[in-house]
Amino acid sequence: MKENFNVSKLKNGLTILTYNMPYVNSVAINLIAKVGSRYENPGEEGIAHFLEHMAFKGTKTRTAKQIAEEFDSIGGHFNAYTGHEKTVYYSRVLSENCNKALAIIADIVQNSAFAEEEIAKEYQVILQEIAHAQDNPDDLVYEKFYNSVFKDQPLGKPILGTSKTIETFNRDHFLKFTGKHYNAENFYLSIAGNVDHEEIVKEAERLFSSLTQGEKSNFSPAKYIGGHSFINKDLEQTTLILGFEGTSYINLERLYQTQLLAIIFGGGMSSRLFQHIREKLGLAYAVGSYNSPYFDSGVFTIYASTAHDKLELLAAELKNEIKRMAEQVKQEEIERARTQIRSNLQMAQEKVAYKSEEIGKNYAVFGKYISPEEIMEIIMNIKAADIIQTANRIFSSSATSAVIGPNNLSGF
C-alpha cells in the first residue's frame, strides 16, 4: 500500500521516510547511517562498531545516565547495531513520545562527547565482546570463512575489529570518522507506525539542523576470492561452512531468483538439504542455505554440523545435492518457496519495527521503496529455468570452506 508511504528530503540532504499505520499506537524509528565496517581504512578496523557503542556514553548536553533515564521515562526501547555496510540506531516508543525519542537519537549522532574516560571503559567492554566471539564456535568459524571469501578486504574482516586496532582509538579518531561519514547524505531516517509525515519532517528539520550535507561515502569494490580454513578445536560436533559467490543487491530479479534457490535448497523443513541430509541420512541436526547480499557482491552459504567421523560423508552428500540442484527444479518446490516468501512478507507488514527497517533499507540500497506487491510480481515471474541458471552460475564459482572441529576436510 504505497499510499501510506511518504518520502521527503531536507535541505541538508537528509532523507525522511515514513509509513503510516494508523491502527497501531506505537512507532518504530530507524536512523540508518550508510557506513559500516567495509568503509574503514587500514588501521581503522572496528571503529564503526566502537563508534556505535559510544552513542550510549553521553553527548554535549546529556550524560550516559541521562540518556538511559530519558528513554526509560518514556517507556521506550533504544539500541543500535553495526553491519558491514550500515550502522543503525533504532527505537520503539508510543506514538505520543516519537518526538522525544527522535530528539535523543538526533543528539547522539550529532553531539556525542567521546570523552576519553568513556572510551577507555568501552574499550574494555568491546575486548570482552571480542573474547566472547573467539570462544563461540559459530562466530569463530564464520569469521574464518569470511576471511577466505573476501581475503585482505574490509568485507572479510570482523566488524568488531581486533584488540590491536581498537586499543589505538581516541577522541580524535572518532571525530575524524564521524566528520567524514556522519553527514546528511549518508543518513536515512525511517519511521513506521501511527505517524504524521509532515510533522516528522518539521521536527527533523529542527533536530538535524546541525547535520552537514557532506558527500556520500565510498568503499573499495569487493572481490570474491575463496579458499579453505580449518580451526582445530575439541568440540562435540564438527561444523562445516561452504560458500560460493552469491548475488548482490544490484539486480532485483537475480536477487529473488537466488532467494527462491536458497529456500528450495536449504530454507525449510521441506528443503532438499533438510530432507536428504537430516531426515534421510541423519547426518546433521542443523543444515541449511541462504544468500547474503551486499551492494556489489554476495555470498551463498551452506552450513551443517555433524559427528566428527561423518565429516567426509557430509561433504560428499552436499556435493551431490549441489549437482542435483543445478540440474532440475520441480514446480511444486517453486510453489512452496513462493508461498514461504509471500507468507513471511504479509505477516511482517503487521510489525512496525519491520516496516521501519524495510523502507529505510529499500532507500539505502535501491534508492526507492519496493512494495510487497512488487516483490511478489517479481517472484511469480521466476521460472524453473531461471532458478537452474542461477544455481549453475553460483555453484560454478570457486568454493569456500571452513571447518571447526578436531578433523580437517580432505578436499571439496
From Swiss-Prot:
InterPro entries: Metalloenz_LuxS/M16 (IPR011249), MPP/UQCRC_Complex (IPR050361), Pept_M16_N (IPR011765), Pept_M16_Zn_BS (IPR001431), Peptidase_M16_C (IPR007863). The active site is at 52 (proton acceptor). This is Uncharacterized zinc protease RBE_0522. Its cofactor is Zn(2+). Belongs to the peptidase M16 family. Its EC number is 3.4.24.-. Signal peptide: none annotated. GO terms for molecular function: metal ion binding; metalloendopeptidase activity. GO terms for biological process: proteolysis. PROSITE patterns: INSULINASE (PS00143). Zn(2+) binds at residues 49, 53, 129. Keywords: Hydrolase, Metal-binding, Metalloprotease, Protease, Zinc. Gene3D superfamilies: Metalloenzyme, LuxS/M16 peptidase-like. Divalent metal cations. Binds Zn(2+).
